[in-house]
Amino acid sequence: MANALHNIICLEAEWEYRYDKRNNKFSLNTEPLLNWLRTFHGCDIVYRHILNKQDLQYYLDYFASHKREFKKYDIIYIACHGKHHAISLEGEEGDIDLSELNTMANGFFENRIIHFGSCKTLANLDEVKRFKEDCGAKLVSGYEISVDAMTSAIADAAFFNEIMYYQNIGIFKNEASSKFRKRYESLHKELKFRVY
């Protein structure tokens, strides 16, 4: 087990996977993926389950007020439903757009990689660029369209697997020189996976 250059905080909402025929519609979660990353790469993981906007705000406030403790966690993985330039929490009325999410984070996203494991959150390029600039993120990644849970989990795993040993994460934005972008080109095109 090698030591990764990055560590992850995952904030995951409840998933009601409507396409699932099983009795347990709330059976999806990212914890197995995160455990695999921890075991394979030796990275540290903080996993928090959020049920509603208040939970999300609680954890963002906690992380922001304890920045020194969480300095080494430079990847923020937000796993939930999404809509055009917004995230959506199961059972909550309304969405949280990127601007509101940045306000809720209270500076915690600065100099971090923010990955959205959610449908359509990166659908509006102008909003994504504004979010990245306003929050000071190193990199913002995710999907422009509605994505299948299993296929997007594969893309998320590939992304985290590749990024673990890169200090210069800017290379992921360059389609011409990024081995990651070339290796998974067809998957990225299918899912409209974006890196900014």
Please provide the spans of the model-predicted regions:
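A domain-level signal for caspase-like cysteine endopeptidase catalytic cores
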Residues: 1-73, 110-117
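Hydrophobic, Leu/Ile/Phe/Ala-enriched alpha-helical segments that form helix-helix packing faces
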Residues: 32-41, 60-68, 105, 132, ...
